[in-house]
Amino acid sequence: MATDIKKMISNLMEFYDFKNQTIITVGSGGGQFIEYGHVSKNVMAIDNDEIALQKLKENLVKSGLDSKFTLIHSDFYLTNLKADVVMFEFCLHEMKDPLAAIKHAQTMAPNILVTDHWPDSKWAYYVDEEEKVKKSWAAINSLKTKKVQEYDGLQLFNDYEEIYQKVKVQGENSIRRIAEFKDKKNITIPMSYGFALI
């Protein structure tokens, strides 16, 4: 599978100025977007998934950014840190109550940056997350935003087996939805995403 991560990072760096910022990241997982660490002051990465944090640590070492990041294995709601910005990395839709998550983040920083699937993203449909994504954007839109931007991206897969391996953890709905790709090669799925600054 491939997405144009470099383009997503470029869009993120244009959307928000991370220079000399203290950043709290939520759901930083495997560290796909760690490039902002090069210009930031420091980063506190919170994730409740130890395996994801281990992968992040490995990526930080490879990138030479390990000294700028503090990894925190915790439930986000149990943290009480201070920073310039709290960034949700494609995870707000996974929060049980997205509005409560944003409100908690607002106690930690004056700026809240959300990166997530766009509500009408085809990819969100295939991975059976469209309702969760709509709920998270409804929470975002219920608040005063400083700016919001939608982007178009693509998910690329060599064949059905590759897409199946990616979505099987999402459950039976996802597996049914990708059935249309059986026996197909070079599969392209639109993945619109957006950034919101609150």
Where are these regions (language model features)?
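Conserved Class I S-adenosyl-L-methionine
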Residues: 30, 134-135, 142-198
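A short SAM/SAH-binding and catalytic strip from SAM-dependent methyltransferases
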Residues: 84-98
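Mobile, glycine- and charge-enriched loop segments
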Residues: 17-21, 75-86
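Conserved class I S-adenosyl-L-methionine
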Residues: 113-141
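Conserved alpha-helix/loop element of class I SAM-dependent methyltransferases that forms part
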Residues: 2-21, 32
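Class I SAM-dependent methyltransferase SAM/SAH-binding core
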Residues: 24-77
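Short, well-ordered alpha-helix to beta-strand connector turns
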Residues: 20, 40-41, 83, 109-110
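A short, conserved alpha-helix within the catalytic core of class I
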Residues: 94-108
